[in-house]
Structure formats: C-alpha cells, structure tokens
Amino acid sequence: MPLPPQLLPYATKLGFPESETLGKIFAILFKDPDSIAIAGVLPGTVKEISARSGIAEERVREVAKRLARRGIISRILHKEDAYRLFPAMIELRDATVITPDYPQELFDMWEILIRKEMPKIVPLLKSLDLPPMLRVIPIEETVESATQVLDVDSARKIIKGASLITAIPCPCRTQANRVGRAKDCPAPKDVNLCLQVNGFAEAVIDRGVGE
C-alpha cells in the first residue's frame, strides 16, 4: 500500500520511505483524512496544527487526543495542548502494540517490518554513526569492561534515582504473543513487567495505560 504524501516525510524519518508494509501500518493507524492531515503537520499546539492543516481547533483537539490515547502520536508533556510524532520506529511500535483492540494485521505488519525490512537498513544506520536508540543493560551482572556500561546507566541506579516509575504490558512480549513467537516465554502472563521511569512514566500516566 502506498504511503500518503503527507506522511512520506515521517516514513523517511523512520527509515522506510518506500515500504509498502509501513504504508499498511499507517493505513491502520491513520484511518481518516483528518488524522493524516494532522500527523503531517506535527509537532505543534492545537492552535498551530489547526492553522497549518486548515482543520478547526475543536476537531484537531478531538482527533489528536484519540491518536495519543491509541499510541499513534505523543502529547508533549508540560506544554498545553501540544503533540508530536514518535521520533523512532520502535517507539511507535511499542506504543501501539500495547493498545488492546488493534487488528491482527497490525501485529503481522510490525513483524514483517522489523524482522524482514529493518535488517536491510541497519548497515546504512551504522554508516551514519548515529547514537543508538536504546541500550541493553545487564541486570546485576558483572560487566568485564567499565566502558561498556556507565555507572549512571546501571539498572539499580536508574530505579533508585527515578522520581516516578510505572509498569506497562511488555511491548516485545505482547508482539511475540500476537504472532505466535512466545510459546516458551517463562514470563508470567497478564503481569505488567515493563518499567518506565521519569518522563516515559509521565507519558504512560498521561495516556492512561499501565499502572
């Protein structure tokens, strides 16, 4: 499915400007013309979005709230009525898969995008020498080299220093469950295991997911 022209810059930013798979994902997430038009002019306040898109402020507010609640866009915290797109593909994936009522097709398309299409762009991302989107931190395990994980990155220090902690359904396990890859997963079922801290935790509370 072709990408809507308004969302092509976003698809390019995510690294998939020619992906029909991402086009299908966008078709599920942005289901109406107003959603596409609003997403195409983010970031901004409701007033700014209205001016850029030509959509009435009340309609912008209504659509933006719905998109944020469903994990499609993110509200800019500490700035009234302001929204943004997720800057990385994995953030968009994580935010949407923990929304309970998306169709199975969405999970199937995420599986194709991440497992079949993403590996093709990894060499390009490495050549650009961009900072990593995430890091895997050993939990209370000995790290051979002090340069591998900074002390400020240790899990214990992150949790102790957090001003706010929330727990949400694990996006990775949720995705795996929906596509049949989690048969041997030892994690307990129906337990919120993914911890969010500080700003990410605020976003969880603002959206109303997790605990």
Functional labels for PLM-detected ranges:
Residues 79-118:
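Short, amphipathic alpha-helical interaction segments positioned at domain boundaries
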Residues 118-211:
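Catalytic cores of enzyme domains
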Residues 22-27, 71:
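Short secondary-structure capping/turn segments at boundaries of alpha-helices and beta-strands
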Residues 53-69:
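Short amphipathic alpha-helical interaction segments
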Residues 68-79:
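A short, conserved structural fragment
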Residues 1-24:
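Long, low-complexity, charged/polar intrinsically disordered regions in eukaryotic proteins
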Residues 28-35:
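Short helix-coil-helix linker/hinge
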Residues 36-54:
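Short acidic, hydrophobic short linear motifs in intrinsically disordered regions
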